């Protein structure tokens, strides 16, 4: 839930107007909106490269997943792995734009860990891929922007771990 929605829900539950502190937090959130949009745009424009590089890093670190019998063995399964990395990158951009993890929770990570376990997919490979996406994204962003984006990548890793 965004800071705007959370503040309104809290104020309404108490049948009161927004407090000066809540208004200041909303003002800060809104003023950071342009920066969040810029970060999401950079990640979106570079998504193919980020996903490809992250996949290569995972496959290099974990050759077992691309070897016969591995979860990413063969062109089709490798493409599925890269599709999943792209999916998590997209979720991260949703979180960045909204300034909140709610879209990540509601759209994508609830039940994902259980799904991967039922498919026999090693969670460590997925989380390594997400960390590689974070590293690639950080190289495209300034320090403050990288920290902002990094918190959403970290959230996804934590939710899947």
UniProtKB/Swiss-Prot annotation:
Modified residues (N4-methylasparagine): 71
InterPro entries named among the record's database cross-references: Globin-like_sf, Phycobilisome_asu/bsu, Phycobilisome_asu/bsu_sf
PTM characteristics: Contains one covalently linked bilin chromophore.
Entry annotated with the keyword Transmembrane helix: no
Domain of life of the organism encoding this protein: Bacteria
Induction: Constitutively transcribed in vegetative cells, not expressed during hormogonia differentiation in red light.
A Gene Ontology BP annotation from the UniProt entry: photosynthesis
Binding site for (2R,3E)-phycocyanobilin: 81
Keywords: Antenna complex, Bile pigment, Chromophore, Electron transport, Membrane, Methylation, Photosynthesis, Phycobilisome, Thylakoid, Transport
Subunit relationships: Component of the phycobilisome. Heterodimer of an alpha and a beta chain.
Protein family: Belongs to the phycobiliprotein family.
Function comment: Light-harvesting photosynthetic bile pigment-protein from the phycobiliprotein complex. Allophycocyanin has a maximum absorption at approximately 650 nanometers.
Protein name as annotated: Allophycocyanin alpha chain 1
């Amino acid at each position: 839930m965004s800071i705007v929605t959370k503040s309104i829900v809290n104020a309404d539950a108490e049948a009161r107007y927004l407090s000066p502190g809540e208004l200041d937090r909303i003002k800060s959130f809104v003023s950071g909106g342009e920066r969040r949009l810029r970060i999401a745009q950079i990640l979106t424009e570079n998504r193919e490269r980020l996903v490809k590089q992250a996949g290569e890093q995972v496959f290099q670190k974990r050759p077992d997943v691309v070897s016969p019998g591995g979860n990413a063995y063969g062109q089709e399964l490798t493409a599925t792995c890269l599709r999943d990395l792209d999916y998590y990158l997209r979720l991260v951009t949703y979180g960045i734009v909204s300034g909140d993890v709610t879209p990540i929770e509601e759209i994508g990570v609830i039940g994902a860990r259980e799904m991967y376990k039922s498919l026999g997919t090693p969670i460590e490979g997925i989380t390594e891929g997400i960390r590689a996406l974070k590293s690639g994204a950080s190289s495209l962003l300034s320090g403050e922007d990288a920290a902002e984006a990094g918190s959403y990548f970290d959230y996804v890793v934590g939710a899947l771990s």
